[in-house]
Curated annotation (Swiss-Prot):
Pfam families: EFG_C, EFG_III, EFG_IV, GTP_EFTU, GTP_EFTU_D2
Similarity annotation: Belongs to the TRAFAC class translation factor GTPase superfamily. Classic translation factor GTPase family. EF-G/EF-2 subfamily.
Function description: Catalyzes the GTP-dependent ribosomal translocation step during translation elongation. During this step, the ribosome changes from the pre-translocational (PRE) to the post-translocational (POST) state as the newly formed A-site-bound peptidyl-tRNA and P-site-bound deacylated tRNA move to the P and E sites, respectively. Catalyzes the coordinated movement of the two tRNA molecules, the mRNA and conformational changes in the ribosome.
tr-type G domain ranges (all copies): 8-290
One Gene Ontology term of the molecular function aspect: translation elongation factor activity
Record-listed GTP binding positions: 17-24, 88-92, 142-145
Gene3D superfamilies xref list: 3.30.230.10, 3.30.70.240, Elongation Factor G (Translational Gtpase), domain 3, P-loop containing nucleotide triphosphate hydrolases, Translation factors
Species, as recorded: Stutzerimonas stutzeri (strain A1501) (Pseudomonas stutzeri)
Main location: cytoplasm
Gene: fusA
Location relative to the cell: Cytoplasm
Name listed for the protein in its UniProt record: Elongation factor G
Amino acid sequence: MARTTPINRYRNIGICAHVDAGKTTTTERILFYTGLSHKMGEVHDGAATTDWMVQEQERGITITSAAVTTFWQGSRGQYDNYRVNVIDTPGHVDFTIEVERSLRVLDGAVVVFCGTSGVEPQSETVWRQANKYGVPRIVYVNKMDRQGANFLRVVGQIKQRLGHTPVPVQLAIGSEENFAGQIDLIKMKAIYWNDDDKGTTYREEEIPAELMDLAEEYRSNMIEAAAEANEELMNKYLEGGELTIEEIKAGLRQRTIACEIVPAVCGSSFKNKGVPLVLDAVIDYLPAPTEIPPIQGVNPDNEEQVDERHASDDEPFSALAFKIATDPFVGTLTFTRVYSGVLSSGDSVINSVKGKKERVGRMVQMHANQRDEIKECRAGDIAALIGMKDVTTGDTLCSIEKPIILERMDFPEPVISVAVEPKTKADQEKMGIALGKLAQEDPSFRVQTDEETGQTIISGMGELHLDILVDRMRREFNVEANIGKPQVSYRETITKDNVEIEGKFVRQSGGRGQFGHCWIRFSTPDVDEKGNITEGLVFTNEVVGGVVPKEYIPAIQKGIEEQMKNGVVAGYPLIGLKATVFDGSYHDVDSNEMAFKVAASMATKQLAQKGGGKVLEPIMKVEVVTPEDYMGDVMGDLNRRRGLIQGMEDSVSGKVIRAEVPLGEMFGYATDVRSMSQGRASYSMEFSKYAEAPANIVETLVKKQG
């Protein structure tokens, strides 16, 4: 079966935004205008096509990114048929892992901002993630019909707060209830949308006289930005030549793909004014799979060797699994982005990360929650594979003959844990299965059993994250569970360098005894420029002259690692440590691996006193948006929670207060901040760093360990 759409007419895009910027409504309109969904889904009614989990429809927020394949021929049919794969991403900070995951497989993004609230805290998080993966993007300023909406103010905020160069290719005609349409700065025409067909068509008119000067000014800025793309355009521009529409678009496209500029458009998705032009901008400015650098990976047989795969059907097959979803009817769906080659149903591939073969049964292409079965997928496609046995998010699927491990995704460590207990004996087994499936879908969610209490502990990125997972357990797997109080993931570290400690374990009372003896030099872990500690143990062996035989060295390392897991001050894991074994002694008969492991563990335990052991607590970056009347209360409350106010600024919706607050003080904050402000303040929080916990907290924790 040949390719139906040439790969240069593919666009793999994500729609990213802050909560409530109108992202799901925008995606919904895209589906409507591309002819896939005949009745527009509204988030307000809980009926949007991409919000396909029950919880999303109830809460009106998007949690899972559904991948949807659509086709577009231009707002006036001016293009050949383009295949646009849209990945809807969540905007809630507890789900940044989903955003990170989808950005990893996108070629371009449409970042949606609200015309009233502009650049919000989460927008910065999403923007940073897009920078990390070098994703070209365009900006869509939505909700221009809302009170206080101002397109150019939001453009200014993008420049100032996100440090990027936005280039408006449109201007708004009117705003708030008088928002009428856009000025197309490339064609220099005013655009008014047709209400009778829900904004599918528009008419072009002359630009209103009072906006002409502004339009001229922004058009010349836009042309200058386009001319900087290459020498040829620059020379033409400097010599006073008029750039053609094609040249302007080509220049802007080249610079957008290089992540130098961000074209900006505006509209109101809810009022059906502007989404077809957002789609046109996707075609005009965002890259095809062939226009981004080839993806790189390592050879599983030789990790030093870097291989690359180009977006071509002729290269060996390679794809990245970026999302696992459990479907009640077909079982596990593995969403994959194909980077190179062709995959047909029935083929066998290798999961190069785990070294396991998988046979591909059925393949489907998703349209939000409906699916069409397909026989093959090619470079640039996004498809869901059914029946994969052992694939987790971030795994590479590739041809058996030419294996490659594509870049791994980094998943953040969870910061909050709660204990869950099944309500009845019957729920016990079901809960184990349910948690296993949820953990397979979401790598930022962990499940473990507390060895001392036997409780099942689940950990995640925030209270909302865990609430929703427990809710899904109830709905999808019929498991009723009781939830404990949230627990903070504390950590430990040491503060002294080059501490030399002796560990000696001797049991000799006749017969075969135990003898292990080592001297270890401990030092503090390295810290990166952001103040984050390098995790894990950096172990070196400097023993000379065989005073400790080689075969016991791994046992010493193991002893240190095991003690690190159990901590030295209050029973929390030591997050980073450098250890060098440099001396010791052994006994011909009584020494064994066990004895050296215990000796090393005993030496590590002494770090509490000798190494200046400290307990660290997670500090969260909190942003509260509150009307001015409640600002005093909110700030007083943050101070009571041991928060450090980092700064404040004005926004349309009131004051934005930025603070760093220990996670342990933030439980139940959602309810508190609402009651303080009569429901008018909102907040977002994300993990910032680990910092030393105050003495009174450490005392309580040590007592708890008993």
